[in-house]
Amino acid sequence: QSFSNFLPNLMWRKKFTAKSSIRVFYRGSTDFPSINQLQDVVGQSNPLRISSGNPFLKQSYTNFLATRYTFTNSQTGQSFFANIFLRSASNYISNAIYIASADSSIQQGIVLKANSQLTKPINLDGYKSLSSFFTYSIPVKFIKTNINLNAGFSYSRLPGQTNYVNIITDNKVYNGGVVFASNISEYVDFNLSYNASFNNTNTTALNATNTNYVNQSTGLQINLLDKKGWFVQNNITNQAYSGLSAGNNQSFWLWNAAIGKKILKNQAGELKLSVFDLLKQNQSIARVVDANTITDSQTKVLQQYFLLTFTYNLKNFGVAKQQAKNDEEHHGMRGGGPGF
């Protein structure tokens, strides 16, 4: 196949005041089918889940629109940011799933057993998505803390097909959180945060149930430093999941810690011993939603390990180089050495 495209890019920006502005951006893009998707070859590595390519697959065309509004008041320290992203696609590359009710021949010598499924990429219209994120920040001077409030919403409309019947899966995510970020002094700072997301998935697939799940994250970071250069760092996070499939509704703690000392002249060097996942509870839990399936997964991840690091800060390198140049010029002005 051959493809041709017209891919426009447009941007509009307006500055309302010295503190606020808005930018709108549009871009057209394409998503080409892969070689594997175009090849009319049947994959039989898993007899229960056979896959096939589609040589008639077309490219997908996506319209993308982004809007960003910013407000910053440097005098009061307040700021507000709003981001909204919209996408729509024609000829969206999705998957068609056929579940055999009886043994079926799909190619010469290839039989799809009863209750097995055949997956094949197809083009479908109707894909849409929206995502947004809003954040507001304000300083609270009497406790030397910045408070950041954030909220967001995302939506995706995913077209698919099962047994020649078109289906639509709608996925909505609502999230919000708050962060208290403090820098009490040169020697003490902390960060306290809470975030929650509520996920709702609806599908028109036959016999499918609508699902909801909640993910909550609470975190605390504390950094302590003394005048002699010794420091202690702690980062503690709790992750809690509810509403997922059996075995994935869990709550666990992730604690990373470090101790070290700043050394050498002007404390340019740092020697630090870190331990990751002190409690050996780290996990990776996720839900993946596509046009035809909703999958909860739990993946093994690297748990507790230790790391010893040495860091040297070169921030004064340019100053030393300039000082050497000044010394050369100074000696030259004194007329040292033989002349011509």
Regions found by a protein language model. Give the residues of each.
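Exposed, low-structure sequence patches enriched in small/polar residues
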Residues: 1-340
